[in-house]
């Protein structure tokens, strides 16, 4: 189910509401995910698959541990002619998983 807001328990007795539009990326972190937005990040008890279901088509999974907002992608980085990493708008470099590379390339028209 696509949502506009995600309710995140940040600590006992506190729930934070995060606008999906503000999310830049999501990273798997054990039984949790780290949600990155602006200069902040919060832990949320969910799987990356749960987040794929919640997030809309502005997001794409690039690795078994990473989902990123499409408009946050800046560069594909290659080594020996094979794209293996992506650089985000904030200059973070993330791995590009083989299982997700083809879909990303198709969506980018490459």
Where are these regions (language model features)?
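Conserved binding/recognition cores within well-folded domains
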Residues: 1-89
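Short hydrophobic/aromatic patches at helix-to-coil boundaries
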Residues: 106-110
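C-terminal structural segments of small proteins and small subunits
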Residues: 82-102
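DNA major-groove recognition helices of helix-turn-helix
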Residues: 51, 103-104
